[in-house]
Structure formats: C-alpha cells, structure tokens
Amino acid sequence: MYGDSSKMASSTSKSLAEILQPVKRLRSLSPSRETLAPRSCISIRSDPSVGTGVSGEFKLESPSSLTVEQRSRMEFNKYLARSKRNVRLCIERIENAKAEGIEYAKLEELLMEETWLEALQGELQNPYWKNLCRFVESELRGVVPIYPPPHLIFNALNSTPFDRVKAVIIGQDPYHGPGQAMGLAFSVPEGIKPPSSLINIFKELQKDVGCSIPMHGNLERWAVQGVLLLNTVLTVRKHQANSHARKGWEPFTDAVIRTISEKKRGIVFILWGNSAQEKSKLIDATKHHILKAAHPSGLSANRGFFGCRHFSKTNEMLKRLGLSPIDWQL
C-alpha cells in the first residue's frame, strides 16, 4: 500500500505518448463489424441490412420491415457505435490537451457518457473526487505506468449507458500486467491471453448455457448489451495489485452502485467473491436480484463458482421482467 496522494506526486514526467504506448500483443486482431456483432447460443449475428454506415452514423430501417432478430442487431450496433464514439472522444480530449501543452486531460473530462453524467449529477463535486483527481494526475506524471490507459479509465460507464444497464458484474481493480486492462471488469483486449479467472468464467459459461469458449477475452459484447462490468477501483500501478485502493475510487464506484439501486428496478447484480459481496449493502434487495458465488480465480473457483449458473439465472430473471436476455456468446 502506498501513502497519501500528496506524497506520491511527480517524479520524472512522462508524455501521454508514453502512457498510451502500444503494448506487445500475442497476435494482432482488428475486429470488424462482423466480429463485433453479437453471435450466439441465442444467436444474434451481423446483418448487411442493419448497422452503421461508412461514416459511422447509425442506419435506421423501417421498423415494420424488421424481424425481432434484426431489431436486436440494430439495437446492438447502435450502442456499439455509441461506445466507440465515447472512446474516440476521450482520445480526442487527450490529444487536444497535449496540443495545448498539457500532459494529460482532466479525469472528469474522460467520463463521456451523458446518461451517467446526469445520473451521477453532483457526485463529481464531492471533496473525495477532487482528491482522487489530484492523485490520479500525480500518478500519470510518475515514472511507473498506470493501467488502463487514460482513455479507457471510464470504459465501463462509457460502454454501458445508465439507461441500458440490465446486469452488473463487480470486479476489484484492473489487471496490472502490460496491455491487459481495458476498463471492463475481467475483460482483456483481443490478442491478450485471458487470465485464469476469465478462463474459469468461460468454462462456467459453456457448462451453464452451452456457449463455446472464445479464443479471446474481450467482453465488450456484454457491456454493449447492458452488462455493466464495473471494477471497484478503476486504476492500478503496473505490477502492483491494489496500489490504487483506498485513494478515492471506492466512494465513486459505490455511488455508481447506489445510484443504480435507487434509480432503477429489476437489475441483476452478480457478486463473485467476498470483496464484491460486500457491496450488497448498497443494493436494495427488495427491488433487485442479487446472485452470489465464489470468485472465479483459480484458488476459489471450485468452492462455489463452478456450477453457480449465474448466466442462465440472469437471463431467466430478465425474461420474467419482459427484457431481452443477454447473448453471452463472444
């Protein structure tokens, strides 16, 4: 554990180019629209008649001419385009700050999703938030890299709009190895070897709902469909697990969970492991569904994670509410 943010200030400066320096991948995969549209056990595949145009603008078809499956694909593509837009805007803000001679964009400027800014109105004015911003900015100036890269710090919120949330999977802090963290709990970019916890999630997924185990660990499809993949701490130092714990992230992510509980109804909260289950006190169990199991790590997966059937249970709950189920296939 590290000291207060005031003691961790700036050693040698590093540029954003260094912060965002590409990492070495196991293989280079450039997802196309075909690979990003949901596929599945439920099966929602990409369709040339539905999707985004060359300009990235979403193309609408006449609702009366679309099947249920086509409407599902159209909705997925719309939110995928929105997620990509939010990431692009974050990158632009970082580049603009650099062009103005500023080493980094302000932390609050990287939360792009309007629905979350509205839902969390006032939260970014709290004293803890100002202290958190100072801490993260001092870490960005430091010699030890932090993960994920700045434009992906709020990827969970920027990928899953507040009004889109159907389920919440709570993680701890980001993966601390180079290239692993992408701002979505448990997820790694395509081309990066899935960690053991994610492999165990895929094994349970296969046994529970019959989905095939994917060749990658990118959970973006889940996020775009309404599964909020939220870590309780959103940044970490390279090779130093929990190094940004108790620096201000927990009050913020607690506020996210509490806001969902207070302002929405019928959300499925998936809590794996003791750390995630501690967050159940923030959730109104009379309004929402809470699923608990052991953490999927190699040390605890055999103590209650395997066989929990949380994926099928989530979809059963969503169907009872009249909502479309999650296509868990990656």
Task: State where each predicted segment sits.
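N-terminal intrinsically disordered, compositionally biased regulatory/targeting segments
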Residues: M1-Y147, Q329-L330
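A polyanion-binding, active-site-adjacent surface
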Residues: N86, C90-G101, E109-V268, S275-E278, ...
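The substrate-binding groove and active-site-proximal loops of carbohydrate-active enzymes
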Residues: F305
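Short loop/turn segments that flank or connect secondary-structure elements
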Residues: L318-K319
